[in-house]
């Protein structure tokens, strides 16, 4: 099964995650099909914490890919913030 999940990068005690589409049998940080964004849990106020290619995300979900719980919540929050910035602009 194809899943959308976080692959950890960064340094010790300084995590940085790539949002990737991968086969569930692959290792967490192993080979993936497509990189569709990133998540920085330690981002400061002025830094971008999440970037997600929503077109690719929605296309993979339509094809049957299962997002992890954390990725699903990040996508929901990213969609909400993108809608707010679009409404104010």
From Swiss-Prot:
GO terms for cellular component: cytoplasm; small ribosomal subunit. Signal peptide: none annotated. Gene3D superfamilies: 3.30.1320.10. Keywords: Ribonucleoprotein, Ribosomal protein. InterPro entries: Ribosomal_bS16, Ribosomal_bS16_CS, Ribosomal_bS16_dom_sf. GO terms for biological process: translation. One of its GO terms (molecular function) is structural constituent of ribosome. It holds the Pfam family Ribosomal_S16. Belongs to the bacterial ribosomal protein bS16 family. This is Small ribosomal subunit protein bS16. It comes from Psychrobacter arcticus (strain DSM 17307 / VKM B-2377 / 273-4). The lineage of its organism: Bacteria, Pseudomonadati, Pseudomonadota, Gammaproteobacteria, Moraxellales. The gene is rpsP.
